[in-house]
């Protein structure tokens, strides 16, 4: 896996994945009180952020995110008046020489480094260096507990920055994108914004920002699809100029290798339906907790998307569930459980049956035990632990991983 796109870094930063406290390269501590909003115009990535500096107190202004510390100068931000209100410059790669950021009016702009993981793909050493079943059980339990705590901390951070409802909505968006399109879905939700997601135009905004409202899609559509798209186009046309910078590039989406029900068009339709029915989701969670969450997705429908795979496909012979049982369970694990306390979440996770095992889970099992086995593929708890182990230690053998985490 190469270095992540800047868009991915920005989305994860906005969600709170990297925390909210940093130290500038001049040694001053700072705390992000609010990341503000995605910038729709020329200038920094985020507008109207609130930042509390150790020495200067609370400041309101803009935030720019770049890969390299020197990008502030090389990209011309220093002489661009659109960046004059920037209060903080984040970067990932530290320059060899000392860097300095200034605004067009010669004001010093603090810089802080983001530490972003760029893990290589697991090599999957296994077989001859596998561990015993007893050791594997301990490793999986520790990893599942760590994964649950990490996701809980991430939700707490997102909730602190954006509110619990927005954090849940963003989590559902990322989950609907699954592993192939998690970041584009998160970006679509973030750039739409939680406030707008509660409005009547949410579907038009989501499709427009995703880049899926193209003239060709409408011109080549059948009558049913044109009837569906016309009100979306009418709404998007009025605001698309103001959102032009927020529209995602087509290159960020992955369309190949997906099952038809998982096509991004259909998933964005599902996300719009979640947004429109969010009060119902809250009500069902309040009444039945995790069962209410799962029932919400079991009942979720859409007048167009339960009968279509994508905007160019023929209508389906019969309606198909908007969100299947396995995806609903995945959303439960990754969007709902992090909201709960660790003990309650662990209890549900241990009792829940895991989704159908993916290829990576099967490879992780061979990596851990040296052979194919269903031992750790039954419960959601075991699957989560197995995924975490393979993600963190897949380049080593499982016996080497056991040594790294302290043995049994």
What is the predicted function of each stretch?
Residues 1-11:
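N-terminal "leader" segments that precede or initiate the main folded domain
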Residues 141-385, 395-398:
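Hydrophobic, aromatic-lined core segments that form the binding pocket/scaffold
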